[in-house]
Amino acid sequence: MGGDKKFYYYRILTFSRIVVMLLSIINQKLSYMDIQQSSSGQIVKSPKGYNAFVPHSLPPKLDWNNAVVNSLSRADFLLGKLAREGSQLPNPHLLMRPFITREAVLSSKIEGTQATLGEILAANAGAHVKQNPDDLQEVQNYIKALDYGLGRLSEFPLSLRLIKEIHKHLMQGVRGFLATPGEFRRSQNWIGSPGCTLNTAKFVPPPPDNLMECLSEFENFLHDRSLPPLIHIALCHYQFEAIHPFLDGNGRVGRLLIMLLLVEQRMLPTPLLYLSAFFEASRDEYYKQLYNVS
């Protein structure tokens, strides 16, 4: 039990410190559509007359001040401890299954899904659950999408193709299914309060005509290893959310990317670190930090 206690202790420490570091790096990187011109991108006028934000390609010029360097150093140190503890577990996949399920519940909850951890566990055990079937399916799809992505990573690097495949697993048979699961959007989407329009939205991502160029540059940066891994992962998460390439499911795919990149870059042997608990508890701050980058 001593080893288990140490594992959870380091996990909690790493969890909190890396979240703070990620948000700090995202915020310092570079202001969303209440936006004017920004150092992280430009406002373009679409052929239909609305304004949209097109992010610059990565990496940006970063300010390596003491706060960033200290946060990064501490996060790397704690993440290394978590990786070592995780590599010593006799059956990490069995131990991590409840955490993966919890991550799926909380990541989906950020997007409005109401299913609880207890309901998902009960449904997985074959019990009848009164919760909306769509909510249950969305969480179960998240787990399937993560499992699929991890399996593919053992054969192929992260790519636009793999991201589309993950999105297809995530959106299969649930709300948003008609929004072309597994395909990048061919129409404009936007972010804002219910009932808002393209002209009143808080944020409008790249128009369809600009989308594939943005995604091509994003894929190139996915394979760039010139930055410290945690900086790279934070920037990838931001850039994906700024591009918003799917009609639905972008937030969940973006958070899945964090876990997949941690494994792909060998920062963790398995997905031992789950950020959605922090993102859900600090949802307003999470979105604020993302908006502040653009």
Across the structure, where does each feature detected by a protein language model lie?
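FIC/Doc superfamily catalytic core
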Residues: 2-294
